[in-house]
């Protein structure tokens, strides 16, 4: 068997990189590194990163994902995580689930080992006062989203984008989407809370029409 070809095909299908094994190329060094990893986990040491080996190293990376966060000069760059890899994002306020003040999804989602390729976003209006409140509501209901956007614009990522969040009802929608909850309590009666806790009231939407029906005034976005 051509082990180079096998590992390249496996990486393309499953979504892993030689760097997961401490290597930079698909070569003999990678095969040897895979063998050593397999030995350490009690797996068949054949140097091939098949589904079994991939699941083990994927899980290991998920458990220690904080160790792989890229180093930056001023430590101000922001990242999101997809398939155990970091991607930079042009936004100053991003919190990942493993950081001290982040929100970690503990139930209500499905771990996916093969690389998932979501092709659309589902954005929800959470009808909660804050992302923390929304996260707690979702956890209590056994539901989840990948991202929450708070009142101050902070983006909270609660899980790897590659995992399936339970947020859109149908399995078809969930399997192919990224779920986002945008903080907004909706009802004008909460304006006092925003004034006290955020510093200003939200704008009011007073002329919205949906399916030919005029809606009562509701809070918009900052």
Predicted regions and their residues:
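Cell-envelope/ECM-targeting effectors and their regulatory/trafficking segments
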Residues: 1-100
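Active-site-adjacent loop/helix surface patches within enzyme catalytic domains
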Residues: 88-222
